Swiss-Prot record:
SMART domains in the cross-refs: EFP, Elong-fact-P_C
Protein name: Elongation factor P
GO BP of this protein: peptide biosynthetic process
Primary role: Involved in peptide bond synthesis. Stimulates efficient translation and peptide-bond synthesis on native or reconstituted 70S ribosomes in vitro. Probably functions indirectly by altering the affinity of the ribosome for aminoacyl-tRNA, thus increasing their reactivity as acceptors for peptidyl transferase.
Gene that this sequence comes from: efp
Source organism per UniProt: Geobacillus sp. (strain WCH70)
InterPro entries: Elong-fact-P_C, NA-bd_OB-fold, Rib_uL2_dom2, Transl_elong_fac_P/YeiP, Transl_elong_KOW-like, Transl_elong_P/YeiP_cen, Transl_elong_P/YeiP_CS, Transl_elongation_fac_P
GO cellular component, one term: cytoplasm
Gene Ontology molecular functions: translation elongation factor activity
Length: 185
């Protein structure tokens, strides 16, 4: 059991018979009434996102998640195939279950597959990934003084805001938690 006061981003919990990952949380102490924790949770089985409010001090079960190192191989229609790095066993996950992670996955990338009581429930990405820019407007000399940004389409189809000096063909480091530009690789 874990207190909701100890919530951290990325924590996996069991609520109402489902496994949830804490995406965001906020401790709220209103002037009148009891404190509470407002949280944004993602269902690891279905991918659904739900906002849930807990009373301060309320206890929830912490889900024990096992991870296995696997390699992303390819997409087979709506299914995505991963291979265990030790046993060479292959598993398929539906696109709906790993919708958020698909924006960062490229072939032969090593990831961790999350398992709960023998059931595959999702993909755990590294904190950052390197992706190549396939489409962006060219930077114009003198643009950088304003410190603005422009959209860039990456090899996985993800579109991120990048500084003006980024060009097509550049490899970028992208934060997988929020999909933002970190730096050039």
């Amino acid at each position: 059991m874990i207190s909701v006061n100890d919530f951290r981003t990325g924590l996996t919990i069991e609520v109402d018979g489902d496994i949830w990952r804490v995406m965001d949380f906020q401790h709220v102490k209103p002037g009148k009434g009891a404190a509470f924790v407002r949280s944004k949770l993602r269902n690891l089985r279905t991918g659904a996102i739900q906002e849930k409010t807990f009373r301060a001090g309320e206890k929830v079960n912490r889900a024990q998640i096992d991870t296995r190192k696997m390699q992303y191989l390819y997409a087979n229609g709506d299914q995505h195939v991963f291979m265990d790095m030790e046993t060479y066993e292959q598993i398929e996950l539906p696109a709906k279950q790993i919708e958020h992670e698909l924006k960062f996955l490229k072939e032969n990338m090593e990831v961790y597959i999350m398992m709960y009581q023998g059931e595959t429930i999702g993909v755990e990405l590294p904190n950052t990934v390197e992706l190549k820019v396939v489409e962006t407007e060219p930077g114009i000399k003198g643009d950088t003084a304003s410190g603005g940004s422009k959209p860039a389409k990456l090899e996985t189809g993800l579109v991120v805001q990048v500084p003006f000096f980024v060009n097509e063909g550049d490899t970028l480091i992208i934060n997988t938690a929020d999909g933002t530009y970190v730096s050039r690789a």
